[in-house]
Amino acid sequence: LTTKPGHDKLNVFTRSDACGAAEMWGKYLGKNQESIQGVGVFGDPGISDAVKTDPLGIGYNNVIYAYDIKSRKPYPGLDVIPIDINSNGKIDAAENFYSSLDSVMLAIREGVYPSPPARDLYLISKGAPLKKSVTAFLEWILTEGQKYVNEAGYVQLKPEQIEVEKAKLK
């Protein structure tokens, strides 16, 4: 990943639309989304397609657009570039978890993969839910619903996080 003499220049693809992935990468780089320069492409699928078709292409994306949900491997034509988390100039064994979606999800869940660029997602409401059906749905998300999280490409909550969130529903 260099532009030293004798090396080809990378083609950077970024989002042309506002999105959480760009916001988090901006934060990770100490910038904002608008500071990320490159060829603007619309949407997560657009970034993936642009990188797949350009041998010198590089971009960022949400995990579900980098890894096939069925095979749990990176999509054909995409290579996931690891982050040197401890900034020692190499990818140590503890940082090399990109071979499968499951190992990436575990690294995110355990806090090994940094946040940002990883981020939590929340359900929000104006005040506490008043309808029992809404509360029951939120409880389902925190219990039975957790078994569907990984297959949808998201990271399951830790048991202690679930307990904290369940307590808020009482």
Please annotate each region the language model reported.
Residues 1-170:
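Exported/periplasmic ABC-transporter solute-binding proteins
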